[in-house]
Amino acid sequence: MAARYDRAITVFSPDGHLFQVEYAQEAVKKGSTAVGIRGKDIVVLGVEKKSVAKLQEERTVRKICALDEHVCMAFAGLTADARIVINRARVECQSHRLTVEDPVTVEYITRYIATLKQRYTQSNGRRPFGISALIVGFDFDGTPRLYQTDPSGTYHAWKANAIGRSAKTVREFLEKNYTDEAIASDNDAIKLAIKALLEVVQSGGKNIELAVIRRNQPLKILESKEIETLVAEIEKEKEEEAEKKKQKKSS
């Protein structure tokens, strides 16, 4: 009996579950960790990079993609599913520009992606998208935005959030450390994203991918050297803090 609900996308189980949607959410939990931070004049996306094969082109393995000049997205889950969603969202961004002669708001394109995902939970012959996405950008009035969508088609606005394999650990770190002081400058917001990822990424900066959008500026993907420099600064700050604590205890 349970198998019938297990296979059917559009049929609720007696206790109110849509199993295929829940399985899609499990696929997200197996994906690379991604984190989003909303600063005052900046939005930051960081992703845990999986180590690539020796002969593989590194630039072809990207988890952060631009949807428009002022909006970008990071995802956790099935890369092939994400490609479909990204392509559809890019077409919608361009279509909106041509029709309305204005760029999309971040909420508009998030709602479009969430609606697309929701449609795939209610249609026969399809399966839900196995991805969760963090969507960041600036509205044309200069307001920074961060949204998260999941396979069920729900979306919410956040100050900071994480998705993927170790989302719970990273989210707990952000809940403790996200303050106005922690995002006082652009550099502080970037460092907070790196610190959050370093909670779960063991091999330091070389396994982190970072993208930033500043107000009235296009998307910028940070170079590995820039990330390594910031990681070194963070490590130095940690050592100094530990030293101060030692001195306090001894006094």
UniProtKB/Swiss-Prot annotation:
UniProt keyword terms in alphabetical order: Cytoplasm, Nucleus, Proteasome
Chief location category: cytoplasm
SUPFAM superfamilies membership: N-terminal nucleophile aminohydrolases (Ntn hydrolases) (SSF56235)
UniProt entry tagged with the keyword Lipid metabolism: no
NCBIfam families cross-referenced by the UniProt entry: PRK03996.1 (NF003075)
Protein name stated in the entry: Proteasome subunit alpha type-7
Domain of life: Eukaryota
